[in-house]
Amino acid sequence: MEPEKQTEISEFFLQGLSEKPEHQTLLFTMFLSTYLVTIIGNALIILAIITDSHLHTPMYFFLFNLSLVDTLLSSTTVPKMLANIQAQSRAIPFVGCLTQMYAFHLFGTMDSFLLAVMAIDRFVAIVHPQRYLVLMCSPVCGLLLGASWMITNLQSLIHTCLMAQLTFCAGSEISHFFCDLMPLLKLSGSDTHTNELVIFAFGIVVGTSPFSCILLSYIRIFWTVFKIPSTRGKWKAFSTCGLHLTVVSLSYGTIFAVYLQPTSPSSSQKDKAAALMCGVFIPMLNPFIYSIRNKDMKAALGKLIGKVAVPCPRPEQLLDVYHVPGSLLAARDTEMHPIPYPGGVQSLAGNRDME
């Protein structure tokens, strides 16, 4: 069969995580719960940073952006997966497929760049504490963030434009639960040599640069910390970067565990596992990691929740219900006995000693 032109293709079909009907309810419940926790957790982090002036620092500025990117990354794949499970359909429009691929690589790569920028922030805070406010001023933070968005957007745009030039067979099934770059290339009937070269080039430059930056930053951080004479000083220095190091270990540990293995027929399952961990579960865990041992963040979250919580009524606010004179409320050993009467409910204040 002749492959149809890409412009004539209306949709692809996603293989999903499981084709067994008995698994669909479990998958829907699990990923809906995960997605709701991700949205609520990251939204609380974002609102806490916005509303608490004590968190208006470079470190929390980058954490704000990380929470935003994690929310967008999870929203790229999970809602469509839930919709397909609910509708018992595996179809995704061709344009929607390219859009999903663009967004996933944009936010996924941006996540790595933000982790690298946060490593630079921790490097400056520990190695050059006296110059921290000068080196990490607002223009510098804005420049680091803007450059990261520009590079990641350029990479995703080039991948998407090159993919749009390829031809595919109608009714092709993507061996994944969302539209990813490599599974789409495997379905193309065109020459993908250019695409593969671009993927390799970006993998070397964009893929390894954030990790190299993180690695070099922490080598310098550890070298500086080990020279601190007191154990308390070392612990205090390590505590400022421990949470970030936990997230980095989760992210890159997953990638290394999945891809630094011999190629096997189950490579598509490895791709799914890595995508689930990096695109679904780590964005859900990040708010807990950054708040559970962070006193400043816990205090900000406490203030935020206190503002939105419904306040309990004070005793004097109940006067309109019980019609008790204020002077009696000040008396000791008194209690109120609501009794019915034709017009409604009234109360009498009685002294226990007189009963």
From Swiss-Prot:
Cellular component, GO, one term: plasma membrane
Gene Ontology MF, one: olfactory receptor activity
UniProt-recorded name of the protein: Olfactory receptor 1I1
GO biological process, one term: signal transduction
Subcellular compartments: Cell membrane
Organism lineage: Eukaryota, Metazoa, Chordata, Craniata, Vertebrata
Database matches in InterPro entries: GPCR_Rhodpsn (IPR000276), GPCR_Rhodpsn_7TM (IPR017452), Olfact_rcpt (IPR000725)
Tagged with keyword Plastid: no
Ranges per topology, Cytoplasmic: 50-57, 121-139, 220-236, 293-355
CDD domains registered for this protein in UniProt: 7tmA_OR1_7-like
Keyword check for Kinase: no
Species this protein is from: Homo sapiens (Human)
Topological category with respect to the lipid bilayer: Multi-pass membrane protein
